[in-house]
Amino acid sequence: PRRLYYAYDKDVYANQDVDDEFLKSLAEGGFQVGEFAKLCYGIGADNNVKTLEPADAVRQTKELLSLENVNIAEAAFLVGNMFVRADIIEKKGDVINLIEVKAKSWNPLEDTFVSKNGKSTNKAIRPYLYDVAFQKYVLVQALKEMFPEKNFKVNAFLMLADKSKTATVNGLNQLFKIKSAPQKRSVVEVSPDAGDIVSS
């Protein structure tokens, strides 16, 4: 949440890591995973809130949420000074699923959310749980303001890469090519074949 706040006031909070190649490569992997998740949820350009302007992003999100059933990428929610962008929102009637997509790999056969002593959360996953919990909190409060007459049931999920599984498609990552953009932020070019492969 803090990074997102700073990102919108670049004149005051300059990003010192903008030219760090290692951080850039990590971010690019995250972009690829994000695009893959959009395909998994059938999200096209019309349901992808791309604007970086917070007020406009919130307005677009509200318009999309007025539909009975919809999947949205990069939905925006603002309450007071708390602002979040949700990777994926899946709305089915009055049920809203918040899906936070992470490039982190995870083995459900070996890894757990609970530490070995069973008394706290696993340190490796804790920041992701805090992130999705904060997003859910803001989402629930924002929905009360956006749609005061509605009573939504909100669920929150983490979407992680399952490293216990083998990909059924060779070169899956090649369907999501990283391209440099003029503003120094990389973009992902999704192969036209990617949708067919993901849906099969």
For each predicted feature, which ranges?
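Mg2+/Mn2+-dependent nuclease catalytic core
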Residues: 66-200
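Metal-dependent nuclease catalytic cores that hydrolyze phosphodiester bonds in DNA/RNA
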Residues: 1-96, 168
